[in-house]
UniProtKB/Swiss-Prot annotation:
Keyword Chaperone tagged: no
Species of provenance: Influenza A virus (strain A/Mallard/Alberta/88/1976 H3N8)
Pfam families noted in UniProt: Flu_NS2 (PF00601)
Motif, Nuclear export signal: chain positions: 12-21, 85-94
GO biological process: exit of virus from host cell nucleus through nuclear pore
Subunit structure: Interacts with protein M1. May interact with host nucleoporin RAB/HRB and exportin XPO1/CRM1.
Lineage, uppermost ranks: Viruses, Riboviria, Orthornavirae, Negarnaviricota, Polyploviricotina
Anything else known: Average number present in a viral particle is estimated to be 130-200 molecules.
This protein's name: Nuclear export protein
Signal sequence, start to end: none
Length: 121
């Protein structure tokens, strides 16, 4: 995994955990949890591409893998929509910077997951 991506995830998660949004902390905690799960999924998918044995095992459970991949893309789209929603509402520059960076990171991760998945298909 790219060390910049690791740093970006850690930085954004740390900053989000310190925020209090007007909507609710439950929404923010849900976003943080989904970011963490997305990072783990992206890491495991990248590692699967690197190991040919895992490639064979993924192909053998192809239908399940495709469903899981589809679900992750839905989660990414939801997170992107939430980041955009927060950006339209907030006037706090710290929150704006954090969620702009989160949005950029989500787009990068979506692209990486697409690349990995094409390599596995």
């Amino acid at each position: 995994m790219d060390s910049n991506t690791v740093t970006s995830f850690q930085d954004i998660l740390q900053r989000m955990s310190k925020m209090q949004l007007e909507s609710s902390s439950v929404d923010l905690n849900g976003m943080i949890t989904q970011f963490e799960r997305l990072k783990i999924y992206r890491d495991s998918l990248g590692e699967s591409v690197m190991r040919m044995g895992d490639l064979h095992s993924l192909q053998s459970r192809n239908a399940t893998w495709r469903e899981e991949l589809s679900q992750k893309f839905e989660e990414i789209r939801w997170l992107i929509a939430e980041c955009r929603n927060i950006l339209t509402k907030t006037e706090n520059s710290f929150e704006q910077i954090t969620f702009l960076q989160a949005l950029q990171l989500l787009l990068e991760v979506e692209s990486e997951i697409r690349t990995f998945s094409f390599q596995l298909i």
